Amino acid sequence: MFKKYRPVTPGTRQLALPTNEQLTRPCENSRATVKPTKSLLLPKRRTNGRNNNGHITCRHKGGGHKQHYRIVDFKRDKENIPAKVASIEYDPNRTAYIALLNYADGEKRYILAPQGLKAGDKVQTSDEPPFHIGCCMKLRLMPLGSVIHNIELYPGKGGKLVRSAGLSAQLMARSGGYATIRMPSGEVRMINENCRATFGAVSNPERNLRVEGKAGRMRWKGIRPTVRGTAMNPVDHPHGGGEGKHKGNTPQTPWGLYTKGLVTRSNKKSNKLIVKRRRKK
């Protein structure tokens, strides 16, 4: 659900923000959500897109509100111990929501919250049913056609694929020690069937409908302005300079690399595991 604000100021004219109804609140009528668990927080130091030499390696980053990093369990390696979902919480470091699990042995962990998971639900990592949303299992034990997320690339290394808000993959087939997965991009690839994945799609599927409404809200997120190349000088960009508005050459990055369709992915050994590329040839 989204709230569209009345245009009482220029900043609220286009503003559309989520109501975050899935998040857990301390009481029924409270607007505030529950506070994060302190034992699962780490201090986060901003690099603002600079490397160890101070050079900009990622443009358009800088400033933003202070944040704590939430320690999220992507491995889901606590086997055969049931856990109860204590709360669904906001995480400023990722697009999806996170869920706080209270395990039967007393340990607490954060996981990525799938769609439909709510406080009070039971989840666990095991080799047996139930095949419920939020439960984790090896690919070789999952029913074909399952909708999954947080998929490992190598057994025991933790989930690397399908972790952003609203995404999901589908288990298509199994053969020769590999599971065939259809990715959100349309790519079909094989993954070791001993890798783990979690049932369900990632939470917060309507995130792409969010409208910030003003530049200042982007600055709160640590996102700086993006300047067009044609508005620069020739020393700053291949599109810069000239008399009046004109592009005059092939679309390029600031470093002269052709863009708009050029494949930049390097060949890797894992190419043989890709059954169908996401791009149609």
UniProtKB/Swiss-Prot annotation:
BP term (GO), one: cytoplasmic translation
SUPFAM superfamilies recorded: Nucleic acid-binding proteins (SSF50249), Translation proteins SH3-like domain (SSF50104)
InterPro entries: NA-bd_OB-fold (IPR012340), Rib_uL2_dom2 (IPR014722), Ribosomal_uL2 (IPR002171), Ribosomal_uL2_bac/org-type (IPR005880), Ribosomal_uL2_C (IPR022669), Ribosomal_uL2_CS (IPR022671), Ribosomal_uL2_dom3 (IPR014726), Ribosomal_uL2_RNA-bd_dom (IPR022666)
Residue span of region Disordered: 43-63, 228-253
UniProtKB keywords: Ribonucleoprotein, Ribosomal protein, RNA-binding, rRNA-binding
Matching Pfam families: Ribosomal_L2, Ribosomal_L2_C
Molecular-function annotations in GO: rRNA binding; structural constituent of ribosome; transferase activity
Record has Cytoplasm as a keyword: no
Biased segments, Basic and acidic residues type: 236-246
Any one Gene Ontology cellular component term annotated for this protein: large ribosomal subunit
Family: Belongs to the universal ribosomal protein uL2 family.
Role, per record: One of the primary rRNA binding proteins. Required for association of the 30S and 50S subunits to form the 70S ribosome, for tRNA binding and peptide bond formation. It has been suggested to have peptidyltransferase activity; this is somewhat controversial. Makes several contacts with the 16S rRNA in the 70S ribosome.
Assembly mode: Part of the 50S ribosomal subunit. Forms a bridge to the 30S subunit in the 70S ribosome.
Protein name: Large ribosomal subunit protein uL2
